[in-house]
Amino acid sequence: MARIAGVDIPREKRVEIALTYIFGIGPSRATQILLSTGINPNLRVRELTDVQVSLLREEIEQKYQVEGDLRRFENINIKRLMDIGCLRGRRHRLGLPVRGQRTRTNARTRRGGRKTVAGKKKAAAKK
């Protein structure tokens, strides 16, 4: 397995697909990286030479913010929103959808599993 940006890249996959295993690199950015390095996107990772792997590693580390740095950057931005007390920050703090989605129904992913609420007790049957 090739190791790029602290991630083990799967050997059997095409390079274009394998690069997307790195947080911060999607399909379009993977294609862009391969074009700039001149590596064939249809090659399997196991077919890459050491020179090509080091070329990919240098390209990614120099030009892109990936993995831990990117996660840290995102967390800092969310923390900043919470600190200034804007609506987006409050929604993050409360664990609710941030981008204006409805919450009367749906929003289960963001709000978590359903909480069981006790129903009204039925009136005792008259005898």
Swiss-Prot record:
Please give the coiled-coil regions recorded for this protein.
Answer: none
The annotated region (Disordered) lies at 97-127
Taken from the UniProt record, the cysteine pairs bridged by disulfide bonds within this chain are none
Q: How does it assemble?
A: Part of the 30S ribosomal subunit. Forms a loose heterodimer with protein S19. Forms two bridges to the 50S subunit in the 70S ribosome.
A Gene Ontology CC term for this entry?
A: cytosol
**Record's family?**
Belongs to the universal ribosomal protein uS13 family.
Q: Where is the composition biased (Basic residues)?
A: 101-127
Q: What is this protein called?
A: Small ribosomal subunit protein uS13
- Entry's Gene Ontology BP terms: translation
Query: Which keywords does this Swiss-Prot/TrEMBL entry list?
Result: Ribonucleoprotein, Ribosomal protein, RNA-binding, rRNA-binding, tRNA-binding
What NCBIfam families does the record tag this protein with? uS13_bact (TIGR03631)
Recall the GO molecular function terms of this protein's record: rRNA binding; structural constituent of ribosome; tRNA binding
The gene name on file is rpsM
Q: Which HAMAP family match?
A: Ribosomal_uS13
* Record's keyword annotation contains Ribosomal protein: yes
**What does this chain do?**
Located at the top of the head of the 30S subunit, it contacts several helices of the 16S rRNA. In the 70S ribosome it contacts the 23S rRNA (bridge B1a) and protein L5 of the 50S subunit (bridge B1b), connecting the 2 subunits; these bridges are implicated in subunit movement. Contacts the tRNAs in the A and P-sites.
